[in-house]
Curated annotation (Swiss-Prot):
InterPro entries: Ribosomal_uS14, Ribosomal_uS14_bac/plastid. HAMAP family: Ribosomal_uS14_1. One of its GO terms (cellular component) is small ribosomal subunit. Belongs to the universal ribosomal protein uS14 family. Pfam families: Ribosomal_S14. One of its GO terms (molecular function) is structural constituent of ribosome. This is Small ribosomal subunit protein uS14. GO terms for biological process: translation. Keywords: Ribonucleoprotein, Ribosomal protein, RNA-binding, rRNA-binding. Part of the 30S ribosomal subunit. Contacts proteins S3 and S10. PANTHER family: 30S RIBOSOMAL PROTEIN S14, SMALL RIBOSOMAL SUBUNIT PROTEIN US14M. NCBIfam families: PRK08881.1 (NF006477). The gene is rpsN.
Length: 101
């Protein structure tokens, strides 16, 4: 189990990313736009750098919804490998069966 502080930190990051997503997208569009003046592109770059670090989606970490485990998380299910296996063995995941060949 992950510490509560780590789970809360991730939640805070998700909220920060959501808060700044629109503004970041606008600034990135200006930076990539070749028709924009160099000054405008530079100002957009500086404004993007002044935003909080946690506003970047790249800093978010996928965690297991049950345990908070950061590694071995399946995106499709949102569960860590251990909890996914337990759920599959109980039959809680429709369509998921244990491999056999």
């Amino acid at each position: 189990m992950a510490k509560k502080s780590m789970k809360n930190r991730e939640l805070k990051r998700q909220l920060t990313v959501a808060k700044y997503a629109k503004k970041r997208a606008e600034l990135k569009a200006i930076i990539v736009d070749l028709n924009a003046s160099p000054e405008a592109r530079w100002e957009a770059t500086v404004a993007l750098q002044k935003q909080p670090r946690d506003a970047s989606a790249a800093r978010m970490r996928n965690r297991c919804r049950i345990t908070g485990r950061p590694h071995g998380v399946y995106r499709k299910f949102g569960l860590g490998r251990n909890k996914l296996r337990e759920a599959a063995m109980r039959g809680d995941v429709p369509g998921l069966v244990k491999a056999s060949w």
